[in-house]
């Protein structure tokens, strides 16, 4: 199956916004250090958070440290109208919502409703929100549509994760952190000038932690293990031309517990199959009469995981100040792959269904921004945006313990695959946007914005399901048919079927 999708849209907006609607963790109150005012760039130019006319939460590096904010969930806890949905055990289904708008599915070809920007570069991965305050200058969360200020997917809002730049003075920092469940975290940062026009920053972090859960039927989950490395070079060619080059790479190997059963097993002979009647109900053979009642205990025959490897990101930002306006030229490239396995049946049964999913992705983006540099009541921003992503996502369901899947008489199937699919996508987005702001008074700012966007998606999906085999099915008396294509069996007849029949279907 091959689908090509093209879409064009134009967005026009006129708003009158009171400056007081900007909400932030940062305020002008100097009585408490964690509430000091911070400078943001959410509207493409530097401004005090109190002078910004949009609904925003801004958390600087000092607040990140003082409030012990380390994860996406921590940021959501401090941000009004923002929620974060995390898969159990740190799986691959993590999603951000703003005012009820977010990503409803992670299926290939879908896009989130909240745009995440890593140092000005668009990304679909929420993981960039978590990290050390030694490398993150601030996190800016903008609530509400931002399409006339950003290049892509900001219907619900936009999140800017702004990286720290090389400092003017030499600084070397080593931080060690220990915690429950044998948590060990190390952050090493070095930053400073090489000469009067060139600065550098390098950062490395390592985090390990045991699982919160105990497996009563096998090996315990593996917990978390992650690495991150970053290098920056910042060059001032002249007083008005700056070039920032940034590289970072991340990897992790974490547990995932997405299919853990919380209710009792259906292990009577006539129990319905969890997957319809496609394959045997694994709960029938579960060694436990009931699932664990302790929320920190699981019963599984395998240790699930999700891992990212070979992730490399390159970012280049050239800034030219002409006096009347500032021009920014952004070029980025990223490639990475991730892979995960999890217990699909949620039991410790010898009938073991395993879900295997992976993704290899390459994306590149280019953007040019024009930002007014005047001090009057009128300011403006305009930009051109280009983004291309190519991804390949395989997905399989297997039962390597089932001899009738492995020896089905049709095709070699050593992994016991009973379902497989592969999605391939090539997506290109182009956009032109602009916004003019008129500060009518200290309390009122009026904005006029225009946006044009064009999306083209070309994708294909292949699915393979084996229904027929060389060997015969059992007789209808032992294996009744169900209306529709293919043959299915009744789980109530599993025992006699295994005793006297060979199955050539899945």
What are these regions (language model features)?
Residues 216-217, 381, 386-506:
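Signature of Gram-negative outer-membrane beta-barrel scaffolds
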Residues 69, 195-197, 236-240, 322-325, ...:
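Outer-membrane beta-barrel channels and translocator barrels
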Residues 118-120, 143, 192, 233-235, ...:
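Residue-level signature of outer-membrane beta-barrel architecture
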Residues 32-169:
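Acidic, small-polar-rich N-terminal luminal/periplasmic segments of exported/outer-membrane proteins
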Residues 111-113, 125, 134-143, 148-215, ...:
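Outer-membrane beta-barrel translocator/receptor signature
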Residues 1-67, 73-77, 191, 239-240, ...:
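N-terminal Sec signal peptide and the immediately downstream disordered periplasmic leader
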Residues 160, 168-169, 177, 188-286, ...:
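Periplasmic-side early beta-strands and strand-to-turn transitions of outer-membrane beta-barrels
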Residues 172-174, 200-202, 243-245, 327-329, ...:
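Transmembrane beta-strands of outer-membrane beta-barrel proteins
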